[in-house]
Amino acid sequence: MSIIVNLDVVMAKRKISAGELAEKVGITPANLSILKNNKAKAVRFSTLEEICQVLECQPGDILQYIPDK
């Protein structure tokens, strides 16, 4: 099973840079990069909530579940 983070897609639609998003969410650009590049092992609900507020989206717009074949 894989969880894919489609943050780049939503960021592009909202025309927001990684630096701007990190600042508004209150996380470091390095941590945002880890999340964007699907390297994160976990994400706090509070961080996900902030990202959704800033990007005006739902968690399902950012996260995608890919089942194992």
Predicted regions and their residues:
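A short, Lys/Arg-rich alpha-helix, primarily the initiator
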Residues: 1-16
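Residue-level detection of the helix-turn-helix DNA-binding "recognition helix"
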Residues: 12, 26, 37, 67
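Short, basic-rich loop-to-helix N-cap that marks the start of a DNA-contacting helix
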Residues: 39-50
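Short alpha-helical DNA-recognition segment
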Residues: 16-34
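Short C-terminal boundary/hinge segments that cap the last helix of small helical domains
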Residues: 56-69
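Residues within the helices of the helix-turn-helix
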Residues: 8, 19, 49
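The alpha-helix within a helix-turn-helix
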Residues: 11, 22, 52
